[in-house]
């Protein structure tokens, strides 16, 4: 989850399951977009979907082949326990729960140990 207007390196790609140009801002998002592209259970997905508050974006909103929605937020492991990260994830989880999405989760980079 990021704030709208995030200023950082952006990789733009065209993926067949993504409704628009897929913009990724870190390696976790990029790799997960590739995984969604190859996942047969995913019909389509959107990247960086703006929330109603006009300030934040969710990393991935996916539509599964059964019509159910799935939301994923990408977080680097080193930021998982930071207060700002926790606050942003709480905002995202509450928002998508209010909109009836039960399949909400995190995508975290691999443990380097």
Language-model segments: residues:
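Electrostatic, structured charged patches in enzyme active sites and in nucleic-acid/phosphate-binding
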Residues: 1-113
